[in-house]
């Protein structure tokens, strides 16, 4: 914590300036594994005499609307995970933790360091019955889908519930026919809020991602949102690569000019010990497994990058960017200018071109394409000499040489594109672009009339 001594000249009083920490620091997965030297922790207190058979009944009655403690439903998912087995064809390790060796039989529970205690409470079913394993995929599927339902925008929840019912309908049995999925999903928040639910769901999703052909693969419909939870900043960068049509992530990062972006790029990229690009790693599940309380890789921890990426995407007409949530940003004037430069550099890259032809005419086709691009850039420049840099450095240098002054033609082009953005939702990047983009070109970046 920063502590600086200052001196008041008139009263000759010395005092200490202390800076409170209003935000918690980010937590890297690698740090957690280094400090704990174990798999993600899972502490469970199972009900007395718990078995898969008894827990099934509790889960069924929970789904039917009975007042069943969510912890008993977690017991069922835990017992069910023991039946999800697969033999490893290669060693499976992550962050130094051995999940299994080649030839071992593993389950989702193999991903966890499990600490079990006994719950003295018993569950007395309202309607005792014997259920077989044929109901499991239907029961577990509904329970896991409650996670995605509760993370879905409320306007989309009804449609999601209908989709869940359609996907799971083939697995319904006589015992499950009285379950009303829409009613259960509406009342499922108590289960999703249980501290062990995300851990169990993450273990199932990571297991099924490793074994996509497993018989329970359809369960991922409800859990896939847990993969890369807390990685939305990385997802933003990857999306920038896509919309700019770059071959690699580094090629996209080269277009980040604003100074406020530097610390965020470092935050996500400088720790080489995290398994960002390792297959079947714990990394994408850092939030679900509780190995990071504040991810360094989220959009919330990298607001300037999130804002820039979706400003660019909105200008280039991406519905995903237009509908992205507008979050707290950094130095907005710098980000707006950065977005404008990237837009002008890429607006003609629509991707449509002649890709096949006879060998003898290919040079002629390339010459025609170059001439067309030249005409388009000249027209876009409002009659000024066409800007034809070939890389990020060249484009930035072009605007540096102009003292970052945009021509009236360029501002008109921006206005035309912005006005063409369709109806937008409140709180989105698209709304912000329509209302504020032009006015946030900083005063130092004067418009030069042609």
Curated annotation (Swiss-Prot):
InterPro entries for this protein: Rhabdo_ncapsid, Rhabdovirus_ncapsid_C, Rhabdovirus_ncapsid_N, Rhabdovirus_nucleoprotein-like
Keywords: Capsid protein, Helical capsid protein, Host cytoplasm, Ribonucleoprotein, RNA-binding, Viral nucleoprotein, Viral RNA replication, Virion
Main location: virion
Molecular function terms, GO-annotated: RNA binding
Location of the protein in the cell: Virion; Host cytoplasm
One Pfam family hit: Rhabdo_ncap
Superkingdom classification of source: Viruses
Any one of the GO CC terms: helical viral capsid
Ribonucleoprotein as UniProt keyword: yes
Assembly behavior: Homomultimerizes to form the nucleocapsid. Binds to viral genomic RNA. N in nucleocapsid binds the P protein and thereby positions the polymerase on the template. Interaction of N(0) with the P protein prevents the uncontrolled aggregation of N(0).
Protein purpose: Encapsidates the genome, protecting it from nucleases. The encapsidated genomic RNA is termed the NC and serves as template for transcription and replication. Nucleocapsid assembly is concomitant with replication, therefore viral replication depends on the intracellular concentration of free N, termed N(0). All replicative products are resistant to nucleases.
Protein name according to UniProt: Nucleoprotein
Protein's organism: Drosophila melanogaster sigma virus (isolate Drosophila/USA/AP30/2005) (DMelSV)
Biological classification of the source: Viruses, Riboviria, Orthornavirae, Negarnaviricota, Haploviricotina
Gene name per UniProt: N
């Amino acid at each position: 914590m920063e502590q600086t001594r200052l001196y008041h000249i008139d009263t000759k009083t010395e005092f200490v300036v202390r800076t409170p920490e209003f935000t918690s620091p980010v937590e890297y997965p690698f740090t957690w594994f280094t400090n704990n030297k174990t798999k993600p922790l899972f502490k469970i207190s199972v009900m007395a005499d718990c078995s898969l058979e008894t827990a099934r009944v509790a889960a069924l009655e929970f789904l039917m609307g009975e007042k069943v403690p969510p912890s008993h439903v977690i017991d069922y998912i835990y017992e069910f995970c023991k039946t999800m087995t697969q033999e490893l064809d290669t060693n499976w390790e992550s962050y130094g933790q051995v999940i299994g060796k080649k030839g071992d039989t593993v389950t989702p529970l193999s991903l966890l360091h499990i600490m079990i205690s006994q719950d003295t409470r018993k569950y007395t079913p309202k309607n005792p019955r014997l259920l077989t394993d044929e109901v499991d995929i239907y029961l577990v599927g509904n329970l896991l889908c409650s996670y995605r339902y509760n993370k879905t925008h409320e306007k989309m929840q009804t449609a999601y519930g209908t989709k869940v019912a359609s996907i799971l309908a083939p697995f319904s049995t006589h015992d499950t026919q009285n379950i009303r999925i829409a009613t259960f999903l509406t009342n499922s928040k108590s289960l999703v809020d249980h501290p062990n639910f995300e851990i169990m769901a993450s273990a199932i999703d990571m297991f099924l991602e490793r074994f996509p052909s497993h018989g329970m693969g359809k369960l991922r419909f409800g859990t896939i949102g847990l993969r890369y939870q807390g990685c939305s900043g990385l997802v933003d960068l990857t999306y920038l690569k896509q919309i700019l049509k770059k071959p690699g992530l580094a090629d996209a990062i080269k277009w980040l000019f604003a100074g406020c972006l530097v610390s965020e790029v470092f935050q996500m990229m400088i720790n080489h010990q995290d398994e960002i690009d390792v297959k079947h790693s714990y990394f994408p599940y850092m939030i679900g497994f509780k190995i990071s309380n504040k991810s360094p890789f989220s959009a919330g921890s990298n607001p300037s990058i999130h804002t820039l990426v979706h400003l660019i995407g909105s200008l280039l007409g991406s519905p995903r960017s237009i509908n992205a949530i507008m979050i707290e940003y950094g130095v907005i004037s710098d980000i707006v200018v950065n977005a404008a430069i990237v837009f002008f550099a890429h607006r003609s890259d629509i991707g449509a071109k002649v890709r096949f032809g006879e060998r003898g005419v290919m040079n002629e086709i390339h010459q025609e394409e170059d001439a067309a691009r030249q005409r388009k850039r000249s027209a876009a420049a409002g009659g000024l000499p066409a800007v034809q840099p070939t890389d990020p450095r060249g484009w930035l240098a072009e605007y540096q040489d102009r003292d970052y002054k945009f021509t009236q033609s360029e501002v008109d082009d921006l206005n035309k594109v912005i006005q063409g953005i369709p109806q937008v939702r409140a709180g989105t990047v698209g709304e912000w672009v329509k209302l504020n983009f032009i006015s946030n070109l900083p005063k130092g970046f004067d418009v030069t009339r042609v």
